[in-house]
């Protein structure tokens, strides 16, 4: 049950673990359900000997990173539990946030604009890319993005919730406008991240609608046939992307569920 991240089933087996260990299991169950307040409540009074939320020091605002990284850990647990349909269904909202974070890094560094300045948040609970703000603040990039859409027989950008497809074209448009010379390391990093985002776009386009609306069972083999890598390799690529995009990212976070599982096994 620990290996499959089935913490809910362990909680139902009352008295199977000591009270402190059951509190840790309750923390993991709430955390894997993205119930942050509940997860932190169960940590009170526990002395684990390691940080449950490892993070690099002096990293500034953690709210966006914490949300994105915890969502990724849930996706990684789906992959480990071989719940590939759930993994693909969660990929779309996760990747859009990751694309926004990377666009923010590039826009701040090379264009003097933050991604927040281009987003409207009055679209219900969803964010959207503002066409007006994009044309006002980055007219050349906006024109380039529209041309890329027209080249693909798509209409120019409208006021809509963002998509992986639109953000990939936006990213290409931003990279194309970078004037200053890039180091070899910067070039490699950009190439790797663009490749990852395009890979995820293919996966999302191929399977998301069928996973959401049809009685399908996605397998690792089907995913590998689509993108040329299995989900374990894709998870590793996403981990590298998180490290590249977020200075706060401590790679120890990626193994925190294993660390907690090991703690439970040792102290059982």
Question: Whereabouts are the PLM-identified features?
Answer:
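Amphipathic alpha-helical interface elements
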Residues: 62-174
């Amino acid at each position: 049950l620990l290996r499959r991240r089935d913490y809910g089933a362990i909680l139902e087996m009352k008295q199977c673990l000591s009270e402190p260990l059951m509190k840790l299991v309750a923390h993991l169950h709430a955390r894997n359900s993205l119930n942050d307040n509940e997860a932190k409540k169960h940590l009170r009074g526990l002395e684990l000997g390691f940080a449950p939320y490892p993070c690099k020091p002096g990293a500034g605002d953690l709210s966006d990173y914490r949300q994105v990284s915890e969502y990724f850990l849930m996706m990684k647990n789906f992959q480990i539990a071989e719940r590939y349909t759930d993994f693909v269904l969660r990929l779309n909202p996760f990747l859009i946030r990751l694309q926004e974070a990377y666009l923010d890094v590039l826009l701040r560094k090379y264009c003097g604009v933050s991604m927040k300045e281009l987003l409207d948040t009055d679209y219900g609970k969803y964010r959207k890319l503002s066409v007006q703000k994009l044309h006002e603040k980055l007219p050349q990039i906006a024109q380039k993005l529209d041309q890329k859409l027209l080249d693909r027989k798509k209409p120019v950008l409208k006021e809509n919730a963002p998509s992986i497809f639109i953000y990939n074209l936006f990213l290409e448009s931003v990279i194309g406008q970078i004037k200053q010379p890039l180091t070899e390391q910067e070039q490699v990093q950009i190439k790797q991240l663009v490749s990852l985002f395009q890979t995820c776009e293919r996966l999302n386009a191929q399977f998301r609608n069928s996973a959401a609306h049809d009685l399908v069972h996605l397998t690792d083999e089907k995913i590998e046939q689509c993108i040329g890598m299995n989900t374990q390799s894709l998870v590793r690529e996403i981990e590298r992307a998180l490290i590249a995009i977020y200075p706060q990212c401590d790679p120890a976070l990626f193994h925190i569920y294993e660390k907690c599982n090991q703690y439970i096994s040792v102290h059982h």
